[in-house]
């Protein structure tokens, strides 16, 4: 990793799994992180773990974790996530699109249209919307910005 002191990161799907690990590592390296997923209580548990961790930062100071629950399938909720992140932390420096869903398990030949649409909306469209909301602000500040979309088993 590298020195993230003074940087603010929004990480979707960060209450558990890969997203939680990313948030924990970024906070350890100095970034303030937004813990976001659908379940506020699980987000709070993750934020508390990060904020109360005794792990030593290689840079002397850890970042803080805040909670902003969000259902990525709702564009209004995504707008609120961005607005609230800016309100509580300031500029957004890092965006990690980790949240995803898969309402169907089985062969692609059997997937119902509704399930396919949900997968596309949650795993593609929501990330596109979030990027459109955040990346322009990043590009205004610098030619180098950080955005990460994680391909998962749920991705196309």
Spans of model-derived segments:
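A short, exposed helix-loop element centered on a Lys and neighboring polar residues
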Residues: 131-132
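Conserved NAD(P)H cofactor-binding loop of Rossmann-fold oxidoreductase domains
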Residues: 98-104
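Substrate-binding pocket helix/loop in short-chain dehydrogenase/reductase
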Residues: 106-108, 112-120
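Conserved glycine-rich cofactor-binding loop
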Residues: 8, 15-17, 39
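The beta1-alpha1 cofactor-binding region of Rossmann-like NAD(H)/NADP(H)-dependent oxidoreductases
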Residues: 40, 69-81, 113
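Conserved small/polar residues in nucleotide/adenosyl-binding loops
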Residues: 144-152
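Conserved glycine-rich Rossmann-like NAD(P)H-binding loop of the short-chain dehydrogenase/reductase
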Residues: 29-46
